[in-house]
Regions:
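Cysteine-centered motifs
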Residues: 11, 16, 28-33
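Active-site mouth loops of central-metabolism enzymes
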Residues: 44-57, 135-136
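Conserved, mostly hydrophobic/aromatic
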Residues: 48, 73, 109, 154, ...
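N-terminal active-site wall of soluble small-molecule enzyme domains
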Residues: 66, 70-130
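Alpha-helix-loop-beta-strand connector modules within alpha/beta enzyme cores
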Residues: 89-101, 133-140, 171-191, 234-239
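Catalytic cores of alpha/beta
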Residues: 102-115, 139-150, 183-186, 191, ...
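Glycine-rich phosphate-binding active-site loops on the catalytic face of alpha/beta enzymes
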Residues: 120-127, 155-167, 201-234
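Histidine/lysine/aspartate-rich catalytic loop segments that bind and position anionic ligands
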Residues: 134, 140-165
Length: 239
């Protein structure tokens, strides 16, 4: 019996083109593919990116997000001063600092013992000697292939039509994402960004994304009296 790299018996179905591969063949009902499909699912990381502007009550809501099980907060305030970001961090309870990633003003990572930095056009390089988490954004599958090996994780966007940016539409077909997952390009180190909401989580798991990054879907609910129920649902679906 031929084995896949994970030790599963390779698919013996004549219609399965994925023989001996790690990723199960979609639509194939053979026991090998079914077993691999179950085994390769994993809890997804829950990421929230801050609103680009400073918002009243923001730090209280951030504390609330972490209380509901948020894995990482990406602090993104383009155009802000280091003093403004420092003050925001001071208002966030210290117990959450190790779960915060900066998009700007990287020296604050050492000052507050933060989780990591997110490279971007404004800040394309990590500080010299930096030993924390490094992530970056990708807008094509080619970028993912290039940047994933040197990153702890990467964002791929836009996966769905943006909630917060009018006219910012999905850039990838479902077929292209499925192929990238089957090839192992989309994996635990690739997080989906762009229009992500609760309704998309099951699909993102099917596509092997390791995490989901939320922006507009979460921040538009900041003053919703039922937001706690929604946040609990997100945490449960991602687990």
């Amino acid at each position: 019996v031929q084995l896949s790299p994970l030790g599963f018996a390779a698919c013996q179905s004549k219609n399965c083109t994925n023989r001996a591969n790690i990723t199960p063949q979609r639509g194939c009902s053979c026991l090998s593919c079914t077993n691999r499909a179950i085994t390769t699912y994993f809890p997804m990381k829950w990421i929230v990116i801050t609103s680009p502007d400073f918002v009243s009550g923001e730090t209280l809501f951030i504390d609330r997000l972490f209380g509901h099980g948020l894995d990482l907060l990406h602090l993104r305030k383009p155009g802000s001063t280091i003093e403004a970001c420092r003050e925001l961090l001071r208002q966030i309870p210290e117990r959450w600092h190790s779960r915060i990633v900066l998009h700007d003003h990287f020296p604050l990572t050492g000052e507050f013992l933060l989780h990591g930095v997110h490279l971007n056009r404004r800040c394309p390089h990590a500080p010299d000697g930096y030993m924390g988490s490094i992530s970056c954004s990708c807008h094509s599958l080619e970028e993912v292939a290039k940047k994933k090996p040197t990153s702890d994780y990467v964002f791929l966007s836009p996966i769905f039509n943006s909630i917060s940016k009018a006219g910012y539409e999905a850039a990838f077909s479902t077929a292209a994402l499925q192929h990238a997952a089957e090839e192992g390009l989309i994996d635990a180190k690739v997080y989906a960004l762009g229009g992500v909401s609760k309704e998309h989580i099951a699909q993102l798991k099917e596509l092997s994304f390791g995490g989901a990054a939320f922006l507009g879907d979460v921040w538009r609910r900041m003053d919703d009296p039922t937001v706690d129920v929604y946040l609990d649902e997100l945490r449960s679906l991602l687990s």
